[in-house]
């Protein structure tokens, strides 16, 4: 370190559960006489274990199978204690329903309460390959949110 004019340490606070990491880094920097900066990176989407609230819209055109509403509610309630990103949750719900129902067409749209003032409303859709519903899925995806609705409940 004596070959350099100044040496500084940077720690990224990204929401890690072990705050001890930051404390130890701070102490080592102090012992070495190094200036230490802690950059708060929590805005990068850490999973905070705080509840998220959403309205989930599910629309589908069945083929041979339908989902029973109570079963669907129980499945969706299982996400209450599930820590994941909004996009992953909606994609998983969509894929699970496609695997279960083998529908002609399905779409899932999650409208989540904003985090940090930014609204993330992920959308998933599926159209059975080789049918007109495959084209419908593509068309709906291109038109999805083309004219966003006015949101006044957030």
From Swiss-Prot:
Pfam families in the record: QueC (PF06508), QueF (PF14489)
Keyword presence, Chloroplast:
no
**UniProt KW keywords:** Cytoplasm, NADP, Oxidoreductase, Queuosine biosynthesis
Q: What gene is this protein translated from? A: queF
Cellular localization per UniProt: Cytoplasm
Task: Report one GO cellular component.
Answer: cytosol
Q: Which InterPro entries match?
A: GTP-CH-I_C/QueF, NADPH_dep_7-cyano-7-deazaG_red, QueC, QueF, QueF_type1
Query: Can you name this protein?
Result: Putative NADPH-dependent 7-cyano-7-deazaguanine reductase
According to UniProt, the reaction catalysed is: 7-aminomethyl-7-carbaguanine + 2 NADP(+) = 7-cyano-7-deazaguanine + 2 NADPH + 3 H(+)
Task: Explain the purpose of this protein.
Answer: Catalyzes the NADPH-dependent reduction of 7-cyano-7-deazaguanine (preQ0) to 7-aminomethyl-7-deazaguanine (preQ1).
Locate the residues binding substrate: 67-69, 86-87
Q: What is its EC number?
A: 1.7.1.13
């Amino acid at each position: 370190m004596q070959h350099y004019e100044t040496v500084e340490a940077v720690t990224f606070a990204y929401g890690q559960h072990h705050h001890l990491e930051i404390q130890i880094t701070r102490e080592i920097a102090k012992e070495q006489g190094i200036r230490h900066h802690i950059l708060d990176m929590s805005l990068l989407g850490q999973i905070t274990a705080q509840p998220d609230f959403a309205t989930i819209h599910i629309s589908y055109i069945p083929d041979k199978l339908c989902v029973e509403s109570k079963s669907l509610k129980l499945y969706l309630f299982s996400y209450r204690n599930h820590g994941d990103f909004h996009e992953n949750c909606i994609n998983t719900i969509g894929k699970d329903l496609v695997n279960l129902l083998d529908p002609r067409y399905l779409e899932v749209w999650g409208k989540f309460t904003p985090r940090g003032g930014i609204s993330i409303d992920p959308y998933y859709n599926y159209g059975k390959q080789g049918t007109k519903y495959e084209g419908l899925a593509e068309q709906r995806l291109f038109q999805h949110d083309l004219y966003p609705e006015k949101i006044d409940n957030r």
